[in-house]
Amino acid sequence: MNSKVSSPTLLEALSSDFLACKICLEQLHTPKTLPCLHTYCQDCLAQLDIGGQVRCPECREIVPVPAEGVAAFKTNFFVNGLLDLVKARAPGDVHSGKPTCALCPLVGGKSSGGPATARCLDCADDLCQACADGHRCSRQTHKHRVVDLVGYRAGWYDEEARERQASQCPQHPGEALCFLCQPCSQLLCKDCRLGPHIDHPCLPLAEAVRSRKPGLEELLAGVDSNLVELEATRVAEKEALALLREQAASVGTQVEEAAERILKSLLAQKQEVLGQLRALVEAAEEATRERLTKIERQEQVAKAAAAFARRVLSLGLEAEILSLEGAITQRLRQLQDAPWTSGPTRCVLPQLELHPGLEDKNCHLLRLIFEEPKQSPKDSGKGGAGTQGGDEAQGQGDDRTKIGKQGGAQPLTPKEGKDQNPQEDDGVFIERGNRPNKKKKCKGRGKSVSREPSPILRPNLEGSGLLPRPVFSWSFPTRMPGDKRSPRITGLCPYGPQEILVADEQNRVLKRFSLNGDYKGTVQVPEGCSPCSVAALQNAVAFSANAKLYLVSPDGEIQWRRSLSLTQSSHAVAAMPCGDRVAVSVAGHVEVYKKDGSLATRFIPGGKASRGQRALVFLTTSPQGNFVGSDWQQNSVVFCDGLGQVIWEYKGPGLHGCQPGSVSVDKKGYIFLTLREVNKVVILDPKGSLLGDFLTAYHGLEKPRVTTMVDGKYLVVSLSNGTIHVFRVRFPDS
């Protein structure tokens, strides 16, 4: 992999968001650089000062604030120089909108200068035509570069202006920095040189940069090398997880096919094995997600520091490079010497084992075994230790094959399998359709001899048999031949028996589908409307779009519309169980409208004491007429009655630190909550207790967006790619 990264250009630095503060999102004002090399406005950093510490908003590193305050953080001369160049290209006279000459008031006694037509790149002054013609007629200004103002504003002379730009001494305004005091590592102007530093050895800026730049470049190369290693580790982690998912899906299919051929008395064992598979994948996902988060955070921190250092080295002036040299050196050395992540996790893969006594009802016919994946050919030569371990595993596998052929070994129970070392499961005997096959041996896929291997993932076999479980029913795409763009599903609702209505905001249409994916046409929406959330009433459809609530007939005729608050980017819509009222979330409260368009009620969940403390992004209703909402301000799921009284509110660890997503309620009152960031749908009981995961990536979830419940028993889930999955909710007592 090529680790060489191209240097940024001046145009990229001026046109990108590099000069924007990541806190206030405005152009940097009085930029201050933290030790992690992230730059923010001085006033913005002052707002983050808590107890003498500042947490960097980008890398989350905690930085102690100097005793003098945030103003004592290092001033970023590099960013200041770029900001000066940007400001110089902006319109000058705020009243007339036209730039004026900077010299006319000085030489002619006028209160204001004439219209500027040129600019001196050395003086950084706008000049009128007369002043521009005579500007280079003196000895001091003979070598100055005067350019056309229009071309300067267009950016034609950015590179030349940057080269002629001089960093100003903060102690002596108007004096350029031109020396580096070696003992003090401080930039000096001529006046500073004759002051306290007169006896100190000093170097001109150009000479100082030549002596120190190679050291910075060497540190930067080291960080680039670590970035390549981080990227390779991240890719290997994702590949290992993809392999595990593929194998788990394959084994799941085998389990389903085997269970269909046996008696109903084996269903309990079938569910147990599927639960083991889900536990295995979920355990692997959880562990991998934590490692990926750490890897991506390290990668982001290293990239940001390297990008900053690269910009300074390629675009900075001598004074700027030297002013930041200490901070950059410290940060790059810190990143280069920091401990990096270990190699990719060695995981065990499940395999299905069928016992010979298939007709024995007292025998566990379905059981999972776990083995490490076979090493890829390109890694076969890496490290003798891994090959030796594979040979040992092969020998163990041969012994187990012999035992299996003798028929004297009984399959391990799940409890016994828990205590067994997964590394010793290589080459175990597996019987499929009464055909013995010796499984592949593992040679340490992704193992690095220079690092400690990550612990092997063990599946959590402690299933909860009382949870409702999903039964996959249908899956279908929502993109139709007439769509100009890929669908973006922002709303779902039931629309008649076993039919759904899909709000495709990207294509500005409401689509009708049966649960098995048959396209039923559309419900017309007003021209220019992009439906966001949707709900079906009796012979009418309500949807929100562009801060308005619409009620239309099935043929698209507008019955009424209501304006909503502009403080909320989207408004969730839900139909009441009676079918003649619709609820909509508006700026933290809920408004309920009758079918004739009159306002029935308005309430804030929790009453007036919660005013301004709620942000209901998703909303639904229960069969009993209660409301369930995802509150992004409180990061919770709130359950309230029709008067707004909060019955319960869930903020537990089951949210995995994510913002709660779409919510749906089945006929028994169970709440199905979408957690998009972790590819999960979790289930809560009617009292607000978290029961566990209902859907995960094992079930094909990839960035789920919105859900709805049809006929009280079908959970419909839309994905970010426009695909819809339909699952039937099966309870243990059904």
Swiss-Prot record:
Repeat among keywords: yes
Top-level enzyme category: transferase
Alphabetically ordered keywords of this record: Antiviral defense, Coiled coil, Cytoplasm, Immunity, Innate immunity, Metal-binding, Phosphoprotein, Repeat, Transferase, Ubl conjugation pathway, Zinc, Zinc-finger
PROSITE patterns noted in UniProt: ZF_BBOX, ZF_RING_1, ZF_RING_2
Basic and acidic residues: compositionally biased ranges: 372-381
Zinc finger (B box-type): 98-149, 164-205
Record-level GO BP terms: defense response to virus; host-mediated suppression of symbiont invasion; innate immune response; positive regulation of interferon-beta production; positive regulation of type I interferon-mediated signaling pathway; protein K63-linked ubiquitination; protein monoubiquitination; response to type I interferon
Pathway: Protein modification; protein ubiquitination
Binding site for Zn(2+): C169, H172, C192, H197
SUPFAM superfamilies, A to Z: 3-carboxy-cis,cis-mucoante lactonizing enzyme, B-box zinc-binding domain, RING/U-box
Induction statement: By interferon.
Annotated region described as Disordered, given as residue ranges: 372-463
Coiled coil: 215-303
EC number: 2.3.2.27
GO cellular component: cytoplasm
Pfam families linked: zf-B_box (PF00643), zf-RING_UBOX (PF13445)
CDD domains named in the record: Bbox1_TRIM56_C-V, RING-HC_TRIM56_C-V
Disruption phenotype: High susceptibility to DNA virus infection, such as lethal herpes simplex virus-1 (HSV-1). Cells are defective in CGAS-mediated type I interferon IFN-beta production upon HSV-1 infection. No susceptibility to RNA virus infection, such as influenza A virus. No visible phenotype in normal conditions.
Compartmental location: Cytoplasm
PANTHER family for the chain: BONUS, ISOFORM C-RELATED (PTHR25462), E3 UBIQUITIN-PROTEIN LIGASE TRIM56 (PTHR25462:SF299)
Subunit organization: Interacts with STING1. Interacts with TICAM1.
Family: Belongs to the TRIM/RBCC family.
Protein name as catalogued: E3 ubiquitin-protein ligase TRIM56
Organism the protein comes from: Mus musculus (Mouse)
